[in-house]
């Protein structure tokens, strides 16, 4: 991975995110080929209903995205997890918010695994 190209890509994506907000959550991390990536989480002060969700990763490789959420009703916590293989070269990947459930959520988390080359990624979640 060319670090200069990666730094420019991250800077460009961050500028687009800053101009396109507001977002409920913006998650970002790097993934190393053949390793499980870190899980990144955004917790909300109050339950939120997600709208548009977009995932974008750097380069031409593929990565497996694990997207999860928790929703609390009274004392019951319901978790939802979705796994998708994403081709980074195809540009931003739109994710149907119904994959996180149809009720307001308390948090959203994302992790990547099975990257076939080193990459970095952004996930944005807009409100409904």
Residue ranges and their predicted role:
Residues 48-54, 96-121:
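Noncatalytic modules at the cell exterior or secretory-pathway interfaces
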Residues 35, 42, 54, 77-79, ...:
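Residue-level signal for the start and early helices of compact helical domains
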Residues 61-78, 122-127:
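Short, surface-exposed beta-strand/strand-loop-strand elements in extracellular ectodomains
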Residues 1-52, 58-62, 124-128:
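Extracytoplasmic low-complexity, Pro/Thr/Ser/Ala/Gly-rich segments
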Residues 24, 37, 62-64, 77, ...:
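Polar low-complexity intrinsically disordered regions enriched in Ser/Thr and small residues
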Residues 69-100:
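An anionic, turn-rich surface loop/hairpin at beta-sheet edges
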Residues 36-38, 49, 59, 80, ...:
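Residues that act as N-cap/strand-start positions at coil-to-secondary-structure junctions
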């Amino acid at each position: 991975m060319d670090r200069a190209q990666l730094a420019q890509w991250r800077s460009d994506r961050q500028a687009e995110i800053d101009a396109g907000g507001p977002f409920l959550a913006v998650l970002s991390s790097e993934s190393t080929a053949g390793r499980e990536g870190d899980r990144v989480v955004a917790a909300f002060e109050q339950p939120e209903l997600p709208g548009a969700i977009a995932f974008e990763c750097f380069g031409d490789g593929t990565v497996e995205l694990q997207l999860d959420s928790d929703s609390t009703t009274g004392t019951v916590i319901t978790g939802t997890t979705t796994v998708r293989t994403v081709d980074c070269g195809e540009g931003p990947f739109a994710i149907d918010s119904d994959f996180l459930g149809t009720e307001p959520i308390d948090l959203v988390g994302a992790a990547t695994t099975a990257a076939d080359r080193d990459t970095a990624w952004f996930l944005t979640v807009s409100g409904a």
